[in-house]
């Protein structure tokens, strides 16, 4: 803080106590400028220009001390002594006594010279540059005693690392310096002696002692004759007042405007604020007053230095022992994709810690660059030429994974290229191909290799389940045709099949054996009781080399004249034989399933053809068809337009004759297909005793296809029926344990295949 000596002398001559003290920013700026000339090459000189009250902050003072000394850290311990409390009686006298201010004649003369309407430049030259912008209201004068230690942490850490076990007792650490600084006011002489010894022995620290005011000159008889300093501790605050309160009313507003222009615009323009934005309205001689070119240039240089530091951090990471050791441990006998490298990365704790250290350093660097960029934009928003801002892109873990791949596969002949996992190729410098190494085979699931060939790492050695090795590559195994095991389709087209079903053509009739203990064909019977009948093929006895598909069912039912009976049919289908409990119920007229079609025949009796057409959409395997016939009474409703059915007939008066019923014929429409049970048994045998390498997988693939195609023909429902187990159980005569073993083997094999999804089935056959 600088005092105007001439003004101070005049005021002391007027009053016993200080009545008016003015702070002169002008003299303070000259002092800083003098220092700045001595350090023209310092990178922080751009901060030391005249920018107003900012330079009186404690943070800025600490920064200047630290940067001027060339050290990275500053430790200071001090104590203050408040001797005198100083008040400005000039303002108090004006406020309470109403007397004129006892100001210096030169100050009055400068005010009169300004006139009634001075320009901002005149106010700046005659008042601000001579007397400053503020004067002192109250403060505390006293003394201070302080010890300042400037420390270069890098030199200190290198010195500590270089010390061996025999010199550890004399090595200097930050903890040692903290202890010495804390003991300064307890034992000053020995503390200074030890610190000066460390300063001489090492260039890592510099010690400065400051003693000002009466505290440092306590041996004087008259302390009043000793020059004092302003005490700026929190309990002794300095109170300032704007100089405009001492000026006439007509000058106050213009003075404030001139002071702001002087501080913010360096007297090169007029300071203007509008809509929460402030700027300088530049004068004709200073068109770039809003554009601090020196500051902008310094910030651009800082960004360049940050870029260089960014490159150095990345280079240090690549050259670190952790990175080299991680690269050395990577397997070379198969290709490493980014997922595999990331998995190995997470397993290496040392490498992870080193990468986290790099990330933290980069984050701090990036935040520092962001602050500079934001300030750069703020300073240059009114410049005619915008600054050049170039920041390196932050390198994520994905970049380093690709970088590691480049070191592995694009680092031949002293050239390092860039690897692309998508194209599986390298991009070499100057569009050359000499940096590309031989890529090992890819190990993984599906079509990737199970292992690489030991004699040639670029080719597959073995393949995964469901794939076969072909010329060094793994190709999907395609199951051989299952037509020689079991047939599924007929030669008839859909339209032909539909036409033959409509005509109930005998060419698609499957001849089955009719069996019933309750009735006979072409014979009248009393329908009061439920009748059971079945059509069976007895394939195991007569047609062991065939399986059969049902496409439709037709019955011709006749009733006596004027009968009110209505037949009700329930159909169960047994796919491959076995007991009746292993049959499934046909959901007629449910969930879009076909319904019975009734056609009246041109006969004297009431005869109808009842036809159920399944077609290709609802066709399924059948060995036996169980038909249950019940009857119900049909009568007109109360409105005459609707029918009401009564059942069961067992509870109707036995003496009441409801008529009789007979079934002339029953036909099953469908077709028979080739079936070779011995060949399928031989296929199953290969699961335990494969003929050659790969024949077991081929057999499993064929059995899977047979299983899926058989189960696909199950009736509609939320879950498919397990028809394949019925085929094994009744047509191949396998035991229950063998069926379970085969199904388990198929499920396990299917789970290993790529892009497959198994499905749940409902058990039908025990």
UniProtKB/Swiss-Prot annotation:
The lineage of its organism: Eukaryota, Metazoa, Chordata, Craniata, Vertebrata. Belongs to the BRINP family. Inhibits neuronal cell proliferation by negative regulation of the cell cycle transition. Promotes pituitary gonadotrope cell proliferation, migration and invasion, when overexpressed. May play a role in cell pituitary tumor development. Residues 1-33 form the signal peptide. InterPro entries: BRINP (IPR033237), Growth_fac_rcpt_cys_sf (IPR009030), MACPF (IPR020864). One of its GO terms (cellular component) is cytoplasm. This is BMP/retinoic acid-inducible neural-specific protein 3. Pfam families: BRINP, EGF_BRNP1-3, MACPF. Strongly expressed in oral keratinocytes compared to the weak expression in tongue squamous cell carcinoma (SCC). Expressed in endothelial and aortic smooth muscle cells. Overexpressed in gonadotropinomas compared to normal pituitarie tissues. Residues 74-264 form the MACPF domain. It is found in: Secreted; Mitochondrion. It comes from the Eukaryota. The keyword Secreted applies.
């Amino acid at each position: 803080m600088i005092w105007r000596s001439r003004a101070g002398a005049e005021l002391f001559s007027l009053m016993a106590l200080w009545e008016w003290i003015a702070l002169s920013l002008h003299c303070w700026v000259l002092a800083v400028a003098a220092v700045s000339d001595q350090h023209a090459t310092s990178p922080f000189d751009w901060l030391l220009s005249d920018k107003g009250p900012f330079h009186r902050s404690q943070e800025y003072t600490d920064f200047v001390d630290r940067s001027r000394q060339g050290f990275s850290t500053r430790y200071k311990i001090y104590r203050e002594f408040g001797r005198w409390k100083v008040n400005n009686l000039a303002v108090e006298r004006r406020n309470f006594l109403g007397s004129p201010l006892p100001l210096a004649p030169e100050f009055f003369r400068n005010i009169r010279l300004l006139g009634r309407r001075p320009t901002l430049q005149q106010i700046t030259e005659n008042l601000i540059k001579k007397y400053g912008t503020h004067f002192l209201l109250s403060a505390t004068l006293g003394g201070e005693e302080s010890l300042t230690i400037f420390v270069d942490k890098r030199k200190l850490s290198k010195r500590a690392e270089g010390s061996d076990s025999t010199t550890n007792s004399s090595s200097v650490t930050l903890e040692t310096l903290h202890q010495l600084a804390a003991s300064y006011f307890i034992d000053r002489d020995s503390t200074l002696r030890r610190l000066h010894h460390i300063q001489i022995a090492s260039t890592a620290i510099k010690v400065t002692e400051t003693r000002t005011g009466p505290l440092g000159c306590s041996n004087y008889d008259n302390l009043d004759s000793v020059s004092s300093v302003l005490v700026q501790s929190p309990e002794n605050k300095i109170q300032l007042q704007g100089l405009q309160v001492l000026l006439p009313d007509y000058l106050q507003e213009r003075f404030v405007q001139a002071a702001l222009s002087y501080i913010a615009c360096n007297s090169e323009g007029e300071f203007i604020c509008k809509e929460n934005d402030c700027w300088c309205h530049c004068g004709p001689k200073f068109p770039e007053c809003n554009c601090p070119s020196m500051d902008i240039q310094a910030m651009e240089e800082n960004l360049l230095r940050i870029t260089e530091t960014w490159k150095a951090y990345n280079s240090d990471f690549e050259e670190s022992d952790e990175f080299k050791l991680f690269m050395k441990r990577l397997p070379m006998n198969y290709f490493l994709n980014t997922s595999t490298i990331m998995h190995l990365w997470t397993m290496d704790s040392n490498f992870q810690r080193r990468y986290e250290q790099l990330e933290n350093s980069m984050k701090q660097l990036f935040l520092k660059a962001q602050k500079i960029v934001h300030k750069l934009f703020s300073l240059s928003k009114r410049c005619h030429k915008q600054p050049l801002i170039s920041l390196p892109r932050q390198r994520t873990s994905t970049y380093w994974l690709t970088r590691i791949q480049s070191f592995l596969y694009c680092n031949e002949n002293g050239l390092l290229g860039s690897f692309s996992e998508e194209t599986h190729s390298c991009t070499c410098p100057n569009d050359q191909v000499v940096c590309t190494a031989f890529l090992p085979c890819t190990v993984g699931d599906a079509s990737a290799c199970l292992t690489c060939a030991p004699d040639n790492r670029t080719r597959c050695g073995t393949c995964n389940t469901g794939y076969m090795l072909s010329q060094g590559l793994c190709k999907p195994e395609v199951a051989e045709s299952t037509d020689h095991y079991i047939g599924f389709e007929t030669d008839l087209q859909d339209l032909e099949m539909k036409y033959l079903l409509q005509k109930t053509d005998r060419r698609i009739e499957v001849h089955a054996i009719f069996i019933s203990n309750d009735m006979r064909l072409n014979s009248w019977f009393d329908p009061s009781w439920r009748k059971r009948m079945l059509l069976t093929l007895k394939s195991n006895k007569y047609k062991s080399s065939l399986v059969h598909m049902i496409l439709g069912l037709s019955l011709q039912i006749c009733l006596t004249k004027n009968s009110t009976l209505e037949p009700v049919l329930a159909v169960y289908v047994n796919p491959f034989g076995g007991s009746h409990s292993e049959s499934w119920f046909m959901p007629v007229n449910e969930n879009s399933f076909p319904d019975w079609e009734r056609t009246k025949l041109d006969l004297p009796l009431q005869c109808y053809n009842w036809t159920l057409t399944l077609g290709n959409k609802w066709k399924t395997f059948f060995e036996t068809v169980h038909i249950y016939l019940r009857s119900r009474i049909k009568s007109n409703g109360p409105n005459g337009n609707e029918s009401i059915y009564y059942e069961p007939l067992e509870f109707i008066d036995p003496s009441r004759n409801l008529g009789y019923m007979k079934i002339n014929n029953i036909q099953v429409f469908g077709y028979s297909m080739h079936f070779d049970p011995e060949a399928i048994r031989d296929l199953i045998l290969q699961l335990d005793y494969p003929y050659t390498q790969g024949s077991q997988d081929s057999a499993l693939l064929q059995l899977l296809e047979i299983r899926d195609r058989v189960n696909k023909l199950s009736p509609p429902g939320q879950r498919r029926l397990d028809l394949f187990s019925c085929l094994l159980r009744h047509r191949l005569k396998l035991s229950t344990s063998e069926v379970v073993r085969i199904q388990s083997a198929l499920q396990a094999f299917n789970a290993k295949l790529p892009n497959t999804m198994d499905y749940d089935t409902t058990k039908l056959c025990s």
